[in-house]
């Protein structure tokens, strides 16, 4: 049979789809999520620093009012039963308590930094209180 010249023809759809090999299917352990992108995660510490800056700018109370009120009433019951509190008194106690705690944590953070750490530990709180003269 003699050779004939091949002429260029237009494609009519290409090849038929082949069946996927079993080994290739077994390699995919988890099914694809249909193009779902995994959620963005900030690096450790980024969100904490953002929260610190946000709280330093604001003046609102950080402890919820009702849990603090329950705590005050529970502590007051040890001294005298059936005590009544004005809402302004509870508010003043909460303001003073939060101011004390914020100051204590600032000093505690300085103690941790002095020890060349960034993590606050109970011993930092104890040192800060001892330096302040609160606990001998």
Swiss-Prot record:
<feature type="modified residue" description="N6-acetyllysine; alternate">
    <location>
        <position position="19"/>
    </location>
</feature>
<keyword id="KW-0379">Hydroxylation</keyword>
<dbReference type="GO" id="GO:0046982">
    <property type="term" value="F:protein heterodimerization activity"/>
</dbReference>
<feature type="modified residue" description="N6,N6-dimethyllysine; alternate">
    <location>
        <position position="5"/>
    </location>
</feature>
<feature type="modified residue" description="Allysine; alternate">
    <location>
        <position position="5"/>
    </location>
</feature>
<feature type="modified residue" description="N6-succinyllysine; alternate">
    <location>
        <position position="80"/>
    </location>
</feature>
<feature type="modified residue" description="N6-(2-hydroxyisobutyryl)lysine; alternate">
    <location>
        <position position="10"/>
    </location>
</feature>
<keyword id="KW-0539">Nucleus</keyword>
<feature type="modified residue" description="N6-succinyllysine; alternate">
    <location>
        <position position="15"/>
    </location>
</feature>
<feature type="modified residue" description="N6-acetyllysine; alternate">
    <location>
        <position position="15"/>
    </location>
</feature>
<feature type="modified residue" description="N6-(beta-hydroxybutyryl)lysine; alternate">
    <location>
        <position position="57"/>
    </location>
</feature>
<feature type="modified residue" description="N6-glutaryllysine; alternate">
    <location>
        <position position="80"/>
    </location>
</feature>
<feature type="modified residue" description="Phosphothreonine">
    <location>
        <position position="81"/>
    </location>
</feature>
<feature type="modified residue" description="Phosphothreonine; by PKC">
    <location>
        <position position="12"/>
    </location>
</feature>
<feature type="modified residue" description="N6-methyllysine; alternate">
    <location>
        <position position="57"/>
    </location>
</feature>
<protein>
    <recommendedName>
        <fullName>Histone H3.3C</fullName>
    </recommendedName>
</protein>
<feature type="modified residue" description="N6-acetyllysine; alternate">
    <location>
        <position position="28"/>
    </location>
</feature>
<feature type="modified residue" description="N6-(2-hydroxyisobutyryl)lysine; alternate">
    <location>
        <position position="57"/>
    </location>
</feature>
<feature type="modified residue" description="N6-acetyllysine; alternate">
    <location>
        <position position="5"/>
    </location>
</feature>
<feature type="modified residue" description="5-glutamyl serotonin; alternate">
    <location>
        <position position="6"/>
    </location>
</feature>
<feature type="modified residue" description="Phosphothreonine; by PKC">
    <location>
        <position position="7"/>
    </location>
</feature>
<feature type="modified residue" description="Asymmetric dimethylarginine">
    <location>
        <position position="18"/>
    </location>
</feature>
<feature type="modified residue" description="N6-methyllysine; alternate">
    <location>
        <position position="80"/>
    </location>
</feature>
<keyword id="KW-0007">Acetylation</keyword>
<feature type="modified residue" description="N6-glutaryllysine; alternate">
    <location>
        <position position="15"/>
    </location>
</feature>
<feature type="modified residue" description="ADP-ribosylserine; alternate">
    <location>
        <position position="11"/>
    </location>
</feature>
<dbReference type="Pfam" id="PF00125">
    <property type="entry name" value="Histone"/>
</dbReference>
<feature type="modified residue" description="N6,N6-dimethyllysine; alternate">
    <location>
        <position position="28"/>
    </location>
</feature>
<keyword id="KW-0832">Ubl conjugation</keyword>
<feature type="modified residue" description="Phosphoserine; alternate; by AURKB, AURKC and RPS6KA5">
    <location>
        <position position="29"/>
    </location>
</feature>
<comment type="function">
    <text>Core component of nucleosome. Nucleosomes wrap and compact DNA into chromatin, limiting DNA accessibility to the cellular machineries which require DNA as a template. Histones thereby play a central role in transcription regulation, DNA repair, DNA replication and chromosomal stability. DNA accessibility is regulated via a complex set of post-translational modifications of histones, also called histone code, and nucleosome remodeling.</text>
</comment>
<feature type="modified residue" description="N6-(beta-hydroxybutyryl)lysine; alternate">
    <location>
        <position position="19"/>
    </location>
</feature>
<feature type="modified residue" description="Phosphotyrosine">
    <location>
        <position position="42"/>
    </location>
</feature>
<dbReference type="GO" id="GO:0000786">
    <property type="term" value="C:nucleosome"/>
</dbReference>
<feature type="modified residue" description="N6-lactoyllysine; alternate">
    <location>
        <position position="24"/>
    </location>
</feature>
<feature type="modified residue" description="N6,N6,N6-trimethyllysine; alternate">
    <location>
        <position position="80"/>
    </location>
</feature>
<dbReference type="GO" id="GO:0030527">
    <property type="term" value="F:structural constituent of chromatin"/>
</dbReference>
<feature type="modified residue" description="N6-(beta-hydroxybutyryl)lysine; alternate">
    <location>
        <position position="24"/>
    </location>
</feature>
<feature type="modified residue" description="N6-acetyllysine; alternate">
    <location>
        <position position="10"/>
    </location>
</feature>
<feature type="modified residue" description="N6-acetyllysine; alternate">
    <location>
        <position position="80"/>
    </location>
</feature>
<feature type="modified residue" description="N6-methyllysine; alternate">
    <location>
        <position position="28"/>
    </location>
</feature>
<feature type="modified residue" description="N6-methyllysine; alternate">
    <location>
        <position position="37"/>
    </location>
</feature>
């Amino acid at each position: 049979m003699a050779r004939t010249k091949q002429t260029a023809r237009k494609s009519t759809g290409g090849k038929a789809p082949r069946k996927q090999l079993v080994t290739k299917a077994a390699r995919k352990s988890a099914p694809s999520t249909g193009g779902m992108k995994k959620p963005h995660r900030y690096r450790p510490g980024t969100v904490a620093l953002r929260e610190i800056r946000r709280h330093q700018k604001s003046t609102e109370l950080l402890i919820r009012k009702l849990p603090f009120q329950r705590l005050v009433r529970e502590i007051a019951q040890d001294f005298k039963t059936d005590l009544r509190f004005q809402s302004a008194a509870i508010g003043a106690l909460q303001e003073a308590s939060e101011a004390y705690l914020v100051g204590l944590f600032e000093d505690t953070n300085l103690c941790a930094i002095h020890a060349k750490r960034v993590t606050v530990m109970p011993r930092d709180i104890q040192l800060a209180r001892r330096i302040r003269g609160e606990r001998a």
